[in-house]
Design a protein with these regions (language model features):
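Phosphate/diphosphate ligand-binding glycine-rich loop within oxidoreductases
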Residues: 6-121
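Residues at the starts of beta-strands that form the adenosine-phosphate
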Residues: 12, 41, 129, 152-154
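Glycine-rich adenosine-cofactor-binding loop
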Residues: 17, 108, 126-151, 158-159
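Conserved acidic residues
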Residues: 65, 152, 198-199
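Glycine-rich helix-loop-beta junction characteristic of Rossmann-like nucleotide cofactor-binding loops
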Residues: 120-124, 221-223
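NAD(P)-binding Rossmann-fold cofactor-contacting core
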Residues: 151-175
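Rossmann-like adenosine-cofactor binding region
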Residues: 180-223
Length: 223
């Protein structure tokens, strides 16, 4: 295993979420730190929802240099930050906490990561529709990234419409009502959608550890 020898000067970064034991982030970051001779260690903390505020304050008090945030805390963690990047504020979710004076600043790199993935795959979304499954923090970021990339329309499918409507309102508030068409449906409406040549993005926690074999779409789904 490629990992630094920890000393009294080693800087610590971490991932917070629930669950976190399946994450590959420690392996990735610790290996990079070793190869670049960066005196940094990366670990994970499984944090319950009710303990989130205490966890953020405690991490700052303990000198944690920065943290990544995963489900289910990407939205709720925002109320415990001293500063938030403007685009992350508009998205309504953060996945990165940067140590600043007095606390942590929130940012969202999901937008950049998703946009880069589309570019590397050679997929041009301009003028096309997209169907988003789920309406959590990742879905919010992806919707903003799609608008930035020139998507024509977005269809958000979620179990309940409340979070989907929140995303639509956030998009309209930031970009204006004429920038993109955003439609909101529950999963029961999926088979009634009449769209072709669209981008499908699965953002729910279905298929995550420990239920890796689960799939949100049935094998014979018409979607």
């Amino acid at each position: 295993t490629l990992i630094n020898v920890l000393t009294g000067t080693t800087k610590t970064c971490a991932l917070i979420g629930n669950p976190t034991e399946h994450s590959l982030s420690p392996t990735i970051h610790n290996s990079i730190s070793f190869m670049t001779q960066n005196d940094m260690a990366y670990t994970t903390f499984c944090v319950e929802k009710d303990d989130l505020g205490d966890a953020v304050k405690g991490a700052y008090a303990l000198g944690i240099q920065g943290m990544n945030v995963t489900v289910p805390h990407k939205e709720n963690v925002m109320e415990h930050l001293v500063e938030i990047d403007p685009i992350a504020e508009a998205v309504g979710a953060v996945n990165t906490l940067i140590r600043v004076d007095g606390g942590f600043k929130g940012a969202n790199t999901d937008l950049l990561g998703f946009a880069r993935s589309l570019k590397e795959a050679g997929f041009d979304v301009k003028g096309k529709p997209a169907c988003i499954l789920g309406a959590g923090g990742v879905a919010r970021a992806i919707c903003f990234a799609l608008v930035e990339a020139g998507i024509e329309s977005i269809y958000i499918l979620n179990r309940t419409k409340e979070k989907s409507l929140s995303i639509r309102n956030a998009l309209n508030s930031y970009y204006g009502y004429k920038k993109v068409e955003c439609h909101v449906f529950d999963y029961d409406y999926a088979e009634k959608l009449n769209i072709e040549d669209f981008l499908l993005v699965q953002t729910t926690n279905v298929g995550m550890y420990p239920h890796n074999a689960d799939c949100i779409l049935a094998a014979d789904s018409s979607l």
